[in-house]
Swiss-Prot record:
Keywords, sorted A to Z: Amino-acid biosynthesis, Aromatic amino acid biosynthesis, NADP, Oxidoreductase
Subunit description: Homodimer.
Entry-linked Gene3D superfamilies: Leucine Dehydrogenase, chain A, domain 1, NAD(P)-binding Rossmann-like Domain
Name assigned to this protein: Shikimate dehydrogenase (NADP(+))
GO cellular component: cytosol
Record function comment: Involved in the biosynthesis of the chorismate, which leads to the biosynthesis of aromatic amino acids. Catalyzes the reversible NADPH linked reduction of 3-dehydroshikimate (DHSA) to yield shikimate (SA).
Length: 271
């Protein structure tokens, strides 16, 4: 039996086991997916512990996505650029780090038939969640990428390695029509379901609204967007997509789209 798992500090409500167990079942993989709650006292020994336990692959969540990078032998190009690893592969005694949030975001937009190349994207929020999204948009040849944050100067210092523009929320109110608006802030996430990062006036200026929040599935931001005729994309498929990509890395397989859809539909019932 192959051993896999999720590494983090507080893991009680993780949906990851459901994603991975479905992939195991559909691909006849004799696998076990565990939750590994790691105290901060042991954060410097994560990779060695995985090797000792015989773990083949692991997902990594907060607060260890950055901390684990120094412990890895090889880090993928996207994880280096993003500055965070959320997937580890142990193979032939070596450890490899990837960022599958990057791929999960791409899978989410591809499924929703949102074209990136040649279009403009405005990203709300300058937290860690924005990094994989900005990198994917950059690599996919978006015409214009704008990071919107409360502190423009602070955001510039934090994201200066990206080929993007910067804007404050006040400046966002004055823009003309653009293509897509992406929320990477926790606004609208349960239990704060009535919060939204931008006004309806701003939302109306876009054709597409994307929210990486998935609890609730339809946030207030997406509800406002839908009511104003925008195409809307919820964040649940990004979660599914990043998990599926991890499985493809660990097991050298290509997961069928039917499996991805089944996982999405099963998880959708939870919200």
């Amino acid at each position: 039996m192959k051993l896999f798992g999720l590494i983090g500090e507080k893991l009680g409500h993780s949906l990851s086991p459901e994603i991975h167990n479905k992939v195991f079942k559909d691909n006849n993989i004799d696998g076990l997916y565990n939750l590994f709650s790691v105290k901060k006292d042991f954060e410097n020994n994560i990779v060695e512990s995985l090797k000792c336990l015989g773990v083949k692959g692991a997902n990594v969540t907060i607060p260890y996505k950055e901390k684990v990078m120094d412990q890895l032998d090889i880090i993928s190009h996207e994880a280096k650029a993003i500055g965070a690893v959320n997937t580890i592969l142990i193979k032939d005694g070596k450890s490899y780090g990837y960022n599958t949030d990057y791929y999960g975001f791409g899978k989410m937009l591809e499924r929703a038939k949102v074209n990136i190349e040649g279009n403009s994207f405005f990203v709300l929020g300058a937290g860690g969640a924005a990094r994989s999204i900005l990198k994917y948009l950059e690599d996919s040849k978006a015409k214009k990428i704008v990071l919107v944050s409360r502190d423009r100067e602070k955001a510039f210092k934090k994201f200066k390695d990206f080929n993007i523009n910067f804007m404050s929320y006040g400046e966002l109110e004055e823009i003309n029509e653009e293509f897509a608006l992406i929320n990477t802030t926790p606004c609208g996430m349960y239990p704060n379901i009535n919060s939204v990062a931008v006004s309806e006036k701003v939302i109306k200026k876009f054709k597409v609204a994307v929210d990486i929040v998935y609890n609730p599935l339809e946030t207030k931001f997406l509800k406002m967007a839908k009511d104003n005729g925008l195409k809307t994309v919820d964040g649940l498929f990004m979660l599914v997509g990043q998990g599926v990509k991890a499985e493809e890395i660990w097991n050298g397989i290509k997961v069928d789209k039917s499996t991805e859809e089944d996982i999405y539909e099963e998880l959708k019932c939870r919200f």
